[in-house]
UniProtKB/Swiss-Prot annotation:
The gene is fabH2. This is Beta-ketoacyl-[acyl-carrier-protein] synthase III 2. GO terms for biological process: fatty acid biosynthetic process; secondary metabolite biosynthetic process. Catalyzes the condensation reaction of fatty acid synthesis by the addition to an acyl acceptor of two carbons from malonyl-ACP. Catalyzes the first condensation reaction which initiates fatty acid synthesis and may therefore play a role in governing the total rate of fatty acid production. Possesses both acetoacetyl-ACP synthase and acetyl transacylase activities. Its substrate specificity determines the biosynthesis of branched-chain and/or straight-chain of fatty acids. GO terms for cellular component: cytoplasm. InterPro entries: ACP_syn_III_C, ACP_syn_III_N, FabH, Thiolase-like. One of its GO terms (molecular function) is 3-oxoacyl-[acyl-carrier-protein] synthase activity. It comes from Staphylococcus epidermidis (strain ATCC 12228 / FDA PCI 1200). It holds the Pfam family ACP_syn_III. HAMAP family: FabH. The keyword Cell membrane does not apply.
Length: 326
């Protein structure tokens, strides 16, 4: 018997505290106009001092449960994608498992930075279609504010906190996942990093220990040069073309970057769904937050063909072409 994986519910959570562009004028030399022109960001959400990634993950799942009235007692795997876990161990996924009371569910964290959520979805699809699991929560959650240097103008204006969750289930007939790909360019990892135990990479010294460091130009050049090829590669696996897409959901890193990717890939810019305007760059949470905003705006409908492409730190990428089944 063939097994299909189907997305059946989605939820999100963002912290209450809002930090808008005007707030940054008091911290670093910048302005609302400068930030909007270069990034497309107006505001972002910031977690409280005692609010951590696991809290955001759990609240996103509660939102999913409340909106769709789904039974989560038989969830058998939790995949949490994050680069800002509460602890080195145990995992954020284990915390969510405990909070939900799912005694026998597997739990794993994935650190693929901004590509994390699409990696998580692809893993969930593989686990379900192989017959190993039946019901999986995939969560992308970040508290990037806790690893942001607010003296560094080039990065502090970009990042925010948030979480999004999808429920992926076994189905006999209907499937969400059509095609996918993934890869990385580790030699360019120095363009976006946050140090932990080591302070060097390929014998090069790294800076600003414990905070995000980004070579914006390097990341931009890599993304615009590679993401269009990634898009065409995953579409070539399917029977669909660029014109067939209802929506394109890239990682919401920067509005200019997304426009350049769309132009090079021949995707209409109004098909690109983004979350950065109100949430900033939330790394692994940007894609589920973008989906949620589009649903609330009445854009996404059942059976829409949607291409999700995550890319960023690593430099890593993962994409998945889905049919919206909610």
């Amino acid at each position: 018997m063939q097994s299909f994986a189907k997305i059946t519910a989605q939820g999100t959570y963002v912290p209450e505290k809002v930090m808008d562009n005007n707030d940054f004028e008091k911290i670093v030399e910048t302005s609302d106009e400068w930030i909007q022109q270069r990034t497309g960001i107006i505001e972002r959400r910031i977690a409280d001092e005692n609010e951590y990634t696991s809290d955001l993950s759990y609240k996103a799942v509660l939102d999913l449960q409340e909106k769709y009235q789904v039974d989560l007692t038989d969830v058998d795997m939790i995949i949490n994608t994050t680069l800002t876990p509460d602890y080195k161990t145990p995992s954020v996924a284990s915390y969510v498992q405990a909070q939900l009371g799912l005694k026998n569910a597997g739990a794993i964290d994935i650190n693929a930075a901004c590509a994390g959520f699409t990696y998580g979805l692809n893993l969930a699809n593989g686990l379900i279609t192989s017959g190993q699991n039946k019901k999986i929560l995939v969560i992308g959650s970040e508290t990037l504010s806790k690893i942001t240097d607010y003296n560094d103008r080039s990065t502090c204006i970009l990042f925010g906190d948030g979480a999004g969750a999808f429920l992926v289930e076994y189905d006999k007939e209907e499937m969400s996942f059509i095609a996918s790909n993934a890869g990385s360019d580790g030699l360019k990892g120095h363009n976006l990093y946050c140090t932990e135990l080591s302070e060097e990479m390929f014998s090069d010294d790294l800076e600003n220990h414990g905070y995000i460091v980004q070579n914006g130009r390097g990341v931009y050049k890599w993304a615009v040069g590679n993401v269009p090829n990634i898009i065409h590669e995953v579409l070539n696996q399917s029977n669909y073309s660029i014109e067939d897409l209802n929506w394109f959901v890239p990682h919401s890193a920067n509005a200019r970057m997304i426009e350049s990717i769309c132009e090079k890939a021949n995707i209409e810019t109004d098909k690109a769904l983004k979350s950065l305007k109100y949430y900033g760059n939330t790394s692994s949470a940007t894609i589920p937050l973008s989906i949620d905003l589009a649903i609330k705006e009445g854009k996404i409908k059942k059976d829409d063909l949607i291409l999700l492409v995550g890319f960023g730190g690593g430099l890593a990428y993962a994409s998945t072409l889905i049919r919206w089944t909610i």
